[in-house]
Curated annotation (Swiss-Prot):
Function field: Involved in DNA repair and RecF pathway recombination.
Keywords annotated in UniProt: DNA damage, DNA recombination, DNA repair
Organism per entry: Ruegeria sp. (strain TM1040) (Silicibacter sp.)
This protein's name: DNA repair protein RecO
InterPro entries with a match to the protein in the record: ARFGAP/RecO, DNA_rep/recomb_RecO_N, NA-bd_OB-fold, RecO, RecO_C
Family classification: Belongs to the RecO family.
Length: 241
């Protein structure tokens, strides 16, 4: 059997003398691995870089086999990734998180398009941090761990929302938090699409989303550690503050 699709290259590993084992996030087939014969050759290897947009034809005798890919480059993002430390760290974080979090062969077309659009902003460093935060929030949402920041979980008010409950992922107002405030996670305005989206606020927001990646998503995936590439991206962003 075979199919054709577009995909974002997430990981690539040499296999044997000249082949490459790749993982791609495709529009219609989700996270899908396969072997590219000649993928480690001088001709093909430069096109098989993480973040690359590929036209893919997958073939296998049976659906549950690893299968092989024919991969044609559509768009390289290597140049954008090399435009600065933040861009490279961001690309690595996105690819690593997708490879970590996505179930095999389950389509997430909306997340695929958001991921592709995010990577196309790699060389726009002023836009990238906020776009990344929105993407990470959508990643949690699509995988079943979305945050409800619309109103206070305790009172229903929509004003003065300052915290997120680590148990429920719901917003909590300053008044409702009371003496429990130090046990809650910060909810900077940028997480609700408000405020000036300064880097320091985005960093705070990413520490909150990171809590849910570690405490909710990771346990569902066998308690594997969150990819270090995400931490390196936060470090690169912190250097700008």
């Amino acid at each position: 059997m075979d199919w054709r699709d577009q995909g974002i290259l997430l990981t690539v590993r040499r296999h044997g003398e000249s082949s490459a084992l790749i993982e791609v996030f495709t529009e219609d087939h989700g996270l899908h691995a396969g072997l590219v014969r000649g993928g480690a050759s001088r001709k093909m290897a430069p096109h098989l870089q993480p973040g690359a947009q590929l036209d893919l034809t997958w073939s296998a005798r049976l659906e549950d086999h690893l299968g092989t890919y024919k991969a044609e480059p559509l768009r390289s993002r290597a140049g954008m990734a090399l435009s600065g430390r933040l861009a490279l760290a961001g690309l690595n974080a996105v690819c690593a998180l997708l490879a970590f979090a996505l179930p095999d062969r389950a389509p997430y077309p909306a997340l695929y398009h958001r991921s592709s659009a995010l990577l196309d902003l790699l060389d726009s460093e002023d836009l990238w941090p906020l776009a990344y935060l929105r993407w990470e929030l959508s990643l949690l949402e699509d995988l079943g761990y979305g945050l409800d920041l619309s109103a206070c979980a305790a009172t229903g008010v929509t004003q003065d929302l300052r915290y997120v409950s680590p148990k429920t992922g719901r917003a909590v107002s300053g008044a409702a938090a009371g003496e429990w405030a130090d046990r809650l996670l910060p909810l900077p305005p940028v997480m609700r699409g408000e405020g000036a989206a300064e880097d320091i606020e985005i960093l705070t927001a990413l520490r909150t989303t990171g809590f849910f990646l570690e405490s909710k998503l990771a346990p569902a995936l066998g308690n594997r550690p969150i990819p270090e590439a995400r931490g390196r991206f936060l470090d690169a962003l912190a250097r700008r503050v």
